Amino acid sequence: MNLRLAVFDLDGVIVSTDMFHFEAWKRLFAKRWGIVHTPAAEELTKGVARFECMKLLAHYYDIHADDEELRLAAEEKNKIYQQLLMEQLSPSNILPGILQTLALLKERGVYTALASSSRNAPFIIKRLGLEFDYCVDPATISHGKPAPDIYLAAMNHFGVSAQECV
């Protein structure tokens, strides 16, 4: 196999931001509804888009609110999350081996792409000083994960086949 492209997700692969998400949800639920957000509830949110998380958690906590109120709450959560990132995100949040892996791929001439569904991804990678040859904009993707669209967009950008990617 001739490896030409390595495609990475962000959260849980490049960087650990779980604690920031948990804290943001915790603050939101305490402020808006007087609810103590739990780690058990947090497990429901792994890999799920923000508004879908809000709907799942509203159901979990038996919160009765219309979609507009939930959408506003999800946006408030994101503002809290972004503030936490501004205050606390540092290179110590980069997962072990990532910097070495990215350097090795660059040295070997393998393209790197970030395929994250997080709209906060550009801020996070800039803040951490990470560089990718291409970052897929999730706003340009028709179908979110687990559909392959975001990965196909990275492959199409470089004109490579699936056999040339990891």
Q: Which positions does each model-derived feature cover?
A:
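Substrate-recognition "cap/lid" segment bordering the active-site pocket of phosphatases
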Residues: 91, 119-166
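Substrate-recognition element of Asp-dependent hydrolases with the DxDx(T/V) motif
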Residues: 98-127
